[in-house]
């Protein structure tokens, strides 16, 4: 999990009026993105919509006191297909990235097993496919001046391409007029794109 999303706050005054959407809600022990982004939205008299396909994650979030958060139990693609927009802030943080696919870490194996229970397959390829589809589905609802944050996604200087969860989505977003504001591998693992 990356923490670059925290740097997105400095760009929020540049975006149009629109919804704040998080695809992939916070889980116990992670970076706390849902609470942080909810606070940003609240400061702007907005609501955060956080979307997660795991009902247990949604139930845990509903147990917290998050007055300005709508919790939606859905996969990101279905939610974005049905939303009418406008969206000015989008955080793509669902699935997870297997940093060591030849020697997968235990926490990733646990997530892969949970995804399988819920009828989905979690691999690096399915993660990239999901994020690309979400970027495509979100585009008609994105405001002209908007921000998209991609978790666990960075520019790989050695290979000359974007790697990670949204590695396939970043070139598409650049083609839609977004520009890279920040991208970093270690230690924050993420990419922030803006269009204005």
What are the residue ranges of the model-derived segments?
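A short alpha-helical cap/connector motif
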Residues: 1-196
């Amino acid at each position: 999990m990356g923490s670059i999303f925290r740097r997105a706050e400095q760009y929020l005054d540049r975006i149009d009026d629109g919804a704040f959407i998080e695809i992939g809600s916070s889980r116990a022990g992670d970076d706390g993105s849902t609470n942080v982004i909810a606070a940003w939205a609240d400061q702007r008299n907005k609501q955060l919509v956080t979307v997660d396909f795991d009902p247990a994650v949604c139930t845990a979030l509903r147990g917290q006191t998050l007055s300005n958060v709508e919790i939606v139990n859905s996969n990101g693609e279905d939610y974005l297909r049905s939303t009418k927009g406008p969206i000015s802030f989008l955080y793509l943080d669902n699935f997870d990235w297997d940093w060591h696919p030849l020697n997968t870490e235990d926490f990733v194996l646990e997530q892969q097993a949970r995804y399988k229970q819920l009828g989905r397959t979690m691999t690096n390829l399915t993660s990239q496919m999901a994020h690309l589809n979400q970027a495509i589905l979100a585009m008609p609802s994105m405001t002209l001046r908007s921000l998209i944050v991609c978790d666990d996604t960075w520019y790989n200087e050695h290979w000359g391409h974007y790697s990670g969860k949204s590695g396939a989505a970043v070139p598409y977003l650049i083609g839609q007029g977004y520009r890279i504001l920040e991208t970093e591998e270690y230690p924050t693992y993420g990419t922030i794109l803006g269009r204005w």
